[in-house]
UniProtKB/Swiss-Prot annotation:
It comes from Thermosipho africanus (strain TCF52B). It is an enzyme of class 2 (transferase). Belongs to the GHMP kinase family. GalK subfamily. Pathway: Carbohydrate metabolism; galactose metabolism. Mg(2+) binds at S102, E134. The lineage of its organism: Bacteria, Thermotogati, Thermotogota, Thermotogae, Thermotogales. One of its GO terms (cellular component) is cytosol. It catalyses: alpha-D-galactose + ATP = alpha-D-galactose 1-phosphate + ADP + H(+). This is Galactokinase.
Length: 352
């Protein structure tokens, strides 16, 4: 039996998903494909790496296989006993570009196991199992957006998700005449995981000082309690980024794509100066694009300290500057960026 789960890109709402905020992701037309069959021991094979991991019992491997092992362990916590299986994995989602290859692997694994063993897990169960696998087993304390987008997405729509309540609505992606790209900076700075966890701690500290249990209850008035400084900058980003998500949803519904470009630039400036998670390479890409005709908007995507930049451009405009950007980026940083044109996609599904 074969299934596939898509990667995702988040149009806007960065570093808000673990702060009870709003996000606006959509699944992309790049997938993790997974084939499952019976076996006498757990066996996980990656076609991309040409690597096989065999386990007689479910334990940590400190490899890509941990995403699958973590999912199986989370399913077993819910009272199911999973017999050994062989799982073959193939993926065309770029790793490290902020397109959620790990969430797609988790969602594909949970869905495949549910279907194969007839567990009838709901999509929301699959999302929660996948997120808990990453937090509890892999050890990355992520939000829930990536897994949610990989499971629930619908082609030609973005998901407006409230990460506090998990209420969501589909918002039409009316992009006629426009294109979406992600530019992979091909850098990943060492700070990424330590600074990500530090940002989470800073947000929790700010809430403690303010005396509220969620950023959704924080008002502008509350900001005075932070007495300026780093924590104020972090909270300002979260509050303003939530507002930008709401404005972007409105603009999408009203077919005002150009307005969205402005919100993307504002989001990047906020991630650069208030949340302080961008880097020279992604800043360079966004600054370069700002000056160019036909580019509507751009911002860094993902956790930061490298990774990708999302771009909305008028049809045909981006290709005309791609080579110039590549050359200028190379002369500045000594590496070449990678460009991906993205289309929206449905969420996890069986492959016929």
């Amino acid at each position: 039996m074969k299934v596939k789960a898509p990667g995702r890109v988040n149009l806007i709402g960065e570093h808000t998903d673990y702060n009870d905020g709003f996000v606006l992701p959509f699944a992309i037309d790049r997938y993790v494909e997974l084939e499952i069959e019976e076996s006498d021991k757990f066996c996980f094979y990656s076609n991309n790496l040409n690597e096989e991991v065999k386990l007689s019992s479910l334990q940590k491997t400190n490899s890509w296989a941990d995403y699958i092992v973590g999912v199986i362990k989370e399913i077993e916590k819910r009272g199911y006993k999973i017999q050994p299986v062989k799982i073959k994995v193939d993926s065309n989602i770029p790793i490290g570009a902020g397109l959620s290859s790990s969430a797609a692997l988790e969602v594909a694994s949970a869905y495949a196991i549910s279907e194969y063993f007839g567990l009838n897990l709901s999509k929301i169960d699959i999302v929660k199992i996948s997120r808990e696998a990453e937090a509890n087993f892999v050890g990355v304390n992520c939000g829930i957006m990536d897994q949610f987008a990989s499971a629930f997405s619908k082609k030609d729509y973005a998901i407006f998700l409230d990460t506090m309540t998990l209420d969501f609505q589909f918002v039409p992606l009316n992009l006629k005449g426009y294109e979406i790209f992600v530019i992979d900076s091909n850098v990943k700075h060492e700070l990424s995981s330590s600074e990500y966890n530090l940002r989470r701690q800073e947000c929790e500290s700010a809430l403690e000082i303010i005396g509220k249990d969620s950023f959704r209850n924080v008002t502008r008035e509350d900001l005075k309690l932070l007495n300026g400084g780093t924590l104020l900058k972090r909270v300002q980003h979260i509050l303003e980024e939530n507002e930008r998500v709401l404005k972007t949803v409105k603009a999408l519904k009203e077919n005002e794509i150009e307005r969205i470009g402005e919100y993307l630039y504002q989001s990047h400036e906020s991630l650069r100066y208030l949340y302080e998670v961008s880097c020279d390479e992604t800043d360079f890409i966004v600054d370069f694009l700002k000056e160019k005709d036909g580019i509507i908007g751009a911002r860094m995507v993902g956790g930061g300290f490298g990774g990708g930049v999302i771009v909305i451009s008028k049809e045909g405009s981006f290709e005309s500057i791609e080579k110039l950007l590549e050359n200028e980026y190379y002369s500045r940083f000594g590496i070449r960026p990678t460009f991906y044109k993205l289309n929206s996609s449905d969420g996890v599904t069986k492959i016929k």
